Amino acid sequence: MRILGIDPGLRRTGFGVVDAEGSRLRYIASGTIVVPPDLALAQRLKVILDNLREVARETRPDVAALEIVFLNANPSSTLLLGHARGAALCALAESGLDVHEYTALQIKKSTVGTGRAAKEQVQMMVQHLLSLNGTPAPDSADALACAICHAHTGPLQERLSPLAATSRSGKSRIRKGRLLG
């Protein structure tokens, strides 16, 4: 499964592409889309949209993973980040990709082992997990960590989702570790 991870930002949007086969991870590509700050908001969003669309076209991922945005101390910063995230979601939707969303806590915990990891710890673990020669840039590392998070948790979520749906209906049950109809 090829996963495109995205760390959205209005100034810098990181992307990272990883192949996951079982527990094996393989680095494909990563980078940072640097958005000129002197552009109008609509044009800045277009830069993100166009570049992510191109990344998806070139790397041909099967699925995408995106960090969920939470409110922070500055509401206007949160709103602007939401715009960048929206541009990323549009690019992914236009590319026909299913999008899975994760919190920063989930991403850090899945990649580093603790949800309170520092950026440097995330960079070092991404470098280690993907056997990279150098330390990835912060935005690229965050995007790669998002892809790694999906590689670690996405397949489990997909296996559990039918179980969750049927257990609520009361029509299925589990016996000896197997889902019964």
Curated annotation (Swiss-Prot):
<keyword id="KW-0238">DNA-binding</keyword>
<comment type="similarity">
    <text>Belongs to the RuvC family.</text>
</comment>
<dbReference type="InterPro" id="IPR012337">
    <property type="entry name" value="RNaseH-like_sf"/>
</dbReference>
<keyword id="KW-0963">Cytoplasm</keyword>
<protein>
    <recommendedName>
        <fullName>Crossover junction endodeoxyribonuclease RuvC</fullName>
        <ecNumber>3.1.21.10</ecNumber>
    </recommendedName>
</protein>
<dbReference type="GO" id="GO:0048476">
    <property type="term" value="C:Holliday junction resolvase complex"/>
</dbReference>
<dbReference type="GO" id="GO:0005737">
    <property type="term" value="C:cytoplasm"/>
</dbReference>
<feature type="binding site">
    <location>
        <position position="7"/>
    </location>
    <ligand>
        <name>Mg(2+) 1</name>
    </ligand>
</feature>
<dbReference type="GO" id="GO:0003677">
    <property type="term" value="F:DNA binding"/>
</dbReference>
<feature type="active site">
    <location>
        <position position="139"/>
    </location>
</feature>
<keyword id="KW-0540">Nuclease</keyword>
<keyword id="KW-0233">DNA recombination</keyword>
<dbReference type="GO" id="GO:0000287">
    <property type="term" value="F:magnesium ion binding"/>
</dbReference>
<keyword id="KW-0460">Magnesium</keyword>
<keyword id="KW-0234">DNA repair</keyword>
<keyword id="KW-0227">DNA damage</keyword>
<comment type="subunit">
    <text>Homodimer which binds Holliday junction (HJ) DNA. The HJ becomes 2-fold symmetrical on binding to RuvC with unstacked arms; it has a different conformation from HJ DNA in complex with RuvA. In the full resolvosome a probable DNA-RuvA(4)-RuvB(12)-RuvC(2) complex forms which resolves the HJ.</text>
</comment>
<dbReference type="Pfam" id="PF02075">
    <property type="entry name" value="RuvC"/>
</dbReference>
<feature type="binding site">
    <location>
        <position position="139"/>
    </location>
    <ligand>
        <name>Mg(2+) 1</name>
    </ligand>
</feature>
<keyword id="KW-0378">Hydrolase</keyword>
<feature type="binding site">
    <location>
        <position position="67"/>
    </location>
    <ligand>
        <name>Mg(2+) 2</name>
    </ligand>
</feature>
<dbReference type="InterPro" id="IPR020563">
    <property type="entry name" value="X-over_junc_endoDNase_Mg_BS"/>
</dbReference>
<dbReference type="GO" id="GO:0008821">
    <property type="term" value="F:crossover junction DNA endonuclease activity"/>
</dbReference>
<feature type="active site">
    <location>
        <position position="7"/>
    </location>
</feature>
<feature type="active site">
    <location>
        <position position="67"/>
    </location>
</feature>
<dbReference type="GO" id="GO:0006281">
    <property type="term" value="P:DNA repair"/>
</dbReference>
<keyword id="KW-0479">Metal-binding</keyword>
<comment type="function">
    <text>The RuvA-RuvB-RuvC complex processes Holliday junction (HJ) DNA during genetic recombination and DNA repair. Endonuclease that resolves HJ intermediates. Cleaves cruciform DNA by making single-stranded nicks across the HJ at symmetrical positions within the homologous arms, yielding a 5'-phosphate and a 3'-hydroxyl group; requires a central core of homology in the junction. The consensus cleavage sequence is 5'-(A/T)TT(C/G)-3'. Cleavage occurs on the 3'-side of the TT dinucleotide at the point of strand exchange.</text>
</comment>
<dbReference type="GO" id="GO:0006310">
    <property type="term" value="P:DNA recombination"/>
</dbReference>
<keyword id="KW-0255">Endonuclease</keyword>
<dbReference type="InterPro" id="IPR036397">
    <property type="entry name" value="RNaseH_sf"/>
</dbReference>
<dbReference type="InterPro" id="IPR002176">
    <property type="entry name" value="X-over_junc_endoDNase_RuvC"/>
</dbReference>
